[in-house]
Amino acid sequence: DRFTSPVEGANEIKDEVYKRFGFTVNVGISSRKVLAKMASDFEKPNKVHTLFPEEVPVKMWPLPIGELFMAGRSSVETMKKLEIYTIGDLANTDPAILELHLKSHGRKLWEFANGLDDSEVESVRAEAKGVGNSTTLPKDLTTEEEALPVLKNLAASVGRRLRKAGQKAGMVSVEIKYH
Protein backbone atom coordinates (compact mmCIF):
# COMPACT_ATOMS: atom_id res chain seq x y z
CA ASP A 1 0.00 0.00 0.00
CA ARG A 2 1.85 2.99 -1.34
CA PHE A 3 -0.37 5.78 0.00
CA THR A 4 -1.64 6.41 3.51
CA SER A 5 -5.02 7.60 2.21
CA PRO A 6 -6.95 7.95 -1.05
CA VAL A 7 -6.63 11.74 -0.81
CA GLU A 8 -2.85 11.52 -0.46
CA GLY A 9 -2.68 9.20 -3.48
CA ALA A 10 -4.94 11.45 -5.54
CA ASN A 11 -2.87 14.52 -4.69
CA GLU A 12 0.33 12.76 -5.69
CA ILE A 13 -1.17 11.64 -9.00
CA LYS A 14 -2.59 15.12 -9.68
CA ASP A 15 0.77 16.76 -8.97
CA GLU A 16 2.66 14.21 -11.08
CA VAL A 17 0.35 14.79 -14.06
CA TYR A 18 1.04 18.52 -13.84
CA LYS A 19 4.79 17.99 -13.46
CA ARG A 20 5.05 15.56 -16.37
CA PHE A 21 2.48 16.90 -18.80
CA GLY A 22 1.90 20.52 -17.80
CA PHE A 23 -1.87 20.41 -17.36
CA THR A 24 -4.13 20.30 -14.33
CA VAL A 25 -6.61 17.60 -13.40
CA ASN A 26 -9.39 17.36 -10.86
CA VAL A 27 -9.79 14.14 -8.93
CA GLY A 28 -12.99 12.93 -7.30
CA ILE A 29 -12.84 10.20 -4.68
CA SER A 30 -15.75 8.01 -3.61
CA SER A 31 -16.91 4.44 -3.25
CA ARG A 32 -19.33 5.00 -6.15
CA LYS A 33 -18.49 6.16 -9.66
CA VAL A 34 -21.25 8.78 -9.97
CA LEU A 35 -20.15 10.37 -6.71
CA ALA A 36 -16.50 10.38 -7.77
CA LYS A 37 -17.56 12.11 -10.99
CA MET A 38 -19.60 14.69 -9.08
CA ALA A 39 -16.71 15.30 -6.66
CA SER A 40 -14.29 15.88 -9.53
CA ASP A 41 -16.53 18.73 -10.73
CA PHE A 42 -16.88 20.51 -7.36
CA GLU A 43 -14.18 23.16 -7.58
CA LYS A 44 -11.65 23.65 -10.33
CA PRO A 45 -8.88 23.71 -11.31
CA ASN A 46 -6.34 21.25 -9.94
CA LYS A 47 -8.28 20.02 -6.89
CA VAL A 48 -8.99 16.76 -5.07
CA HIS A 49 -12.42 16.28 -3.48
CA THR A 50 -14.22 13.43 -1.74
CA LEU A 51 -17.91 12.67 -1.96
CA PHE A 52 -18.80 9.54 -0.02
CA PRO A 53 -22.46 8.49 0.41
CA GLU A 54 -22.66 9.98 3.91
CA GLU A 55 -21.42 13.36 2.56
CA VAL A 56 -24.11 13.67 -0.14
CA PRO A 57 -26.65 15.75 1.87
CA VAL A 58 -24.04 18.33 2.89
CA LYS A 59 -21.84 18.53 -0.20
CA MET A 60 -24.14 17.69 -3.12
CA TRP A 61 -27.74 18.51 -2.20
CA PRO A 62 -27.25 22.32 -2.04
CA LEU A 63 -25.98 22.39 -5.66
CA PRO A 64 -28.22 23.59 -8.52
CA ILE A 65 -30.02 20.76 -10.29
CA GLY A 66 -28.14 21.45 -13.51
CA GLU A 67 -24.88 20.33 -11.89
CA LEU A 68 -26.09 16.76 -11.38
CA PHE A 69 -24.40 14.22 -13.63
CA MET A 70 -26.69 13.33 -16.58
CA ALA A 71 -29.12 16.21 -15.92
CA GLY A 72 -29.36 17.79 -19.35
CA ARG A 73 -31.02 21.05 -20.32
CA SER A 74 -34.39 19.47 -21.16
CA SER A 75 -34.53 17.47 -17.92
CA VAL A 76 -33.54 20.53 -15.91
CA GLU A 77 -36.31 22.61 -17.52
CA THR A 78 -38.87 19.90 -16.74
CA MET A 79 -37.69 19.68 -13.13
CA LYS A 80 -37.82 23.46 -12.67
CA LYS A 81 -41.49 23.35 -13.76
CA LEU A 82 -41.93 20.83 -10.94
CA GLU A 83 -40.23 23.33 -8.57
CA ILE A 84 -37.09 21.19 -8.31
CA TYR A 85 -34.18 23.63 -8.20
CA THR A 86 -31.44 21.86 -6.24
CA ILE A 87 -30.08 18.34 -6.19
CA GLY A 88 -31.55 18.08 -2.68
CA ASP A 89 -34.99 19.01 -4.01
CA LEU A 90 -34.66 16.18 -6.52
CA ALA A 91 -33.42 13.71 -3.91
CA ASN A 92 -36.49 14.40 -1.79
CA THR A 93 -39.02 14.18 -4.64
CA ASP A 94 -41.18 11.10 -5.04
CA PRO A 95 -39.48 9.06 -7.79
CA ALA A 96 -42.90 8.14 -9.21
CA ILE A 97 -43.49 11.81 -10.05
CA LEU A 98 -40.12 11.98 -11.78
CA GLU A 99 -40.89 8.84 -13.79
CA LEU A 100 -44.22 10.33 -14.83
CA HIS A 101 -42.49 13.39 -16.31
CA LEU A 102 -39.05 12.05 -17.28
CA LYS A 103 -39.64 8.30 -17.72
CA SER A 104 -36.81 5.98 -16.62
CA HIS A 105 -34.33 8.86 -16.81
CA GLY A 106 -36.20 10.51 -13.94
CA ARG A 107 -35.62 7.45 -11.76
CA LYS A 108 -31.91 7.42 -12.69
CA LEU A 109 -31.55 11.12 -11.82
CA TRP A 110 -33.30 10.53 -8.48
CA GLU A 111 -30.87 7.67 -7.76
CA PHE A 112 -27.87 9.85 -8.63
CA ALA A 113 -29.22 12.69 -6.45
CA ASN A 114 -29.37 10.23 -3.57
CA GLY A 115 -25.87 8.92 -4.23
CA LEU A 116 -27.20 5.60 -5.48
CA ASP A 117 -25.26 3.95 -8.26
CA ASP A 118 -24.92 0.25 -8.94
CA SER A 119 -21.50 0.68 -10.55
CA GLU A 120 -19.32 0.64 -7.45
CA VAL A 121 -15.62 1.38 -7.72
CA GLU A 122 -13.62 -1.84 -7.67
CA SER A 123 -11.00 -1.77 -4.95
CA VAL A 124 -9.27 -4.97 -6.00
CA ARG A 125 -7.14 -4.53 -9.08
CA ALA A 126 -7.24 -7.22 -11.71
CA GLU A 127 -3.91 -8.59 -12.81
CA ALA A 128 -2.51 -6.27 -15.44
CA LYS A 129 -2.12 -7.78 -18.87
CA GLY A 130 -0.46 -5.73 -21.52
CA VAL A 131 -1.82 -5.37 -25.02
CA GLY A 132 0.61 -3.68 -27.34
CA ASN A 133 1.73 -3.28 -30.87
CA SER A 134 4.89 -2.07 -32.53
CA THR A 135 6.35 -1.62 -35.95
CA THR A 136 9.72 -0.98 -37.52
CA LEU A 137 9.63 1.54 -40.31
CA PRO A 138 11.86 1.43 -43.39
CA LYS A 139 12.99 5.01 -42.77
CA ASP A 140 12.99 7.50 -39.90
CA LEU A 141 9.98 9.79 -39.75
CA THR A 142 10.76 13.45 -39.17
CA THR A 143 7.39 15.21 -39.03
CA GLU A 144 4.18 14.90 -37.07
CA GLU A 145 2.29 14.49 -40.37
CA GLU A 146 4.34 11.37 -41.14
CA ALA A 147 4.13 9.90 -37.63
CA LEU A 148 0.44 10.47 -36.91
CA PRO A 149 -0.98 7.89 -39.40
CA VAL A 150 1.44 5.26 -38.07
CA LEU A 151 0.41 5.96 -34.46
CA LYS A 152 -3.29 5.93 -35.41
CA ASN A 153 -2.94 2.53 -37.11
CA LEU A 154 -1.08 1.06 -34.12
CA ALA A 155 -3.66 2.48 -31.70
CA ALA A 156 -6.55 1.15 -33.81
CA SER A 157 -4.99 -2.31 -33.81
CA VAL A 158 -4.59 -2.29 -30.03
CA GLY A 159 -8.14 -0.95 -29.63
CA ARG A 160 -9.58 -3.79 -31.72
CA ARG A 161 -7.71 -6.38 -29.66
CA LEU A 162 -8.85 -4.80 -26.39
CA ARG A 163 -12.49 -4.76 -27.52
CA LYS A 164 -12.27 -8.37 -28.71
CA ALA A 165 -10.90 -9.37 -25.28
CA GLY A 166 -13.54 -7.28 -23.47
CA GLN A 167 -10.81 -5.19 -21.83
CA LYS A 168 -10.23 -1.48 -21.28
CA ALA A 169 -6.92 0.33 -21.25
CA GLY A 170 -5.66 1.43 -17.86
CA MET A 171 -2.50 3.00 -19.23
CA VAL A 172 -1.26 4.06 -22.64
CA SER A 173 2.40 4.47 -23.47
CA VAL A 174 4.26 5.30 -26.64
CA GLU A 175 7.89 4.44 -27.20
CA ILE A 176 9.82 6.03 -30.03
CA LYS A 177 13.29 4.87 -30.95
CA TYR A 178 15.45 6.70 -33.41
CA HIS A 179 19.05 6.60 -34.55
Each language-model region and where it sits:
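Gly/Gly-Pro- and Ser/Thr-rich, intrinsically disordered tail segments characteristic of DNA damage-repair
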Residues: 1-101, 105-108, 160
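DNA-contacting surface of Y-family translesion DNA polymerases
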Residues: 75, 80-179
